[in-house]
UniProtKB/Swiss-Prot annotation:
Keyword Acetylation recorded: no
Designated gene of the protein: rpsU
Keywords, ordered alphabetically: Ribonucleoprotein, Ribosomal protein
Entry GO MF terms: structural constituent of ribosome
Name of the protein this chain belongs to: Small ribosomal subunit protein bS21
Statement: the UniProt record of this protein carries the keyword Ribonucleoprotein: yes
Taxonomic source organism: Parasynechococcus marenigrum (strain WH8102)
Family note: Belongs to the bacterial ribosomal protein bS21 family.
Superkingdom of origin: Bacteria
Recorded GO CC terms: ribonucleoprotein complex; ribosome
One GO BP annotation of this record: translation
Listed Pfam families: Ribosomal_S21
InterPro entries documented for this protein: Ribosomal_bS21, Ribosomal_bS21_CS, Ribosomal_bS21_sf
PANTHER family for this protein: MITOCHONDRIAL 28S RIBOSOMAL PROTEIN S21, SMALL RIBOSOMAL SUBUNIT PROTEIN BS21M
Amino acid sequence: MSQVTVGENEGIESALRRFKRSVAKAGIFSDLRRIRHHETPVEKYKSKLKQRSRNRRR
């Protein structure tokens, strides 16, 4: 779970931006999409290929 503490002089907008960035970095939305929708075997294979190419770029 992502958690962001808001500083005294920090605005809500910047804290929200930091929270969204941490959620994206943790991969929470991609997990939700995967869990909520059924994937056919072909879609699973394609998503694994995409993930491998993303990891190779890093």
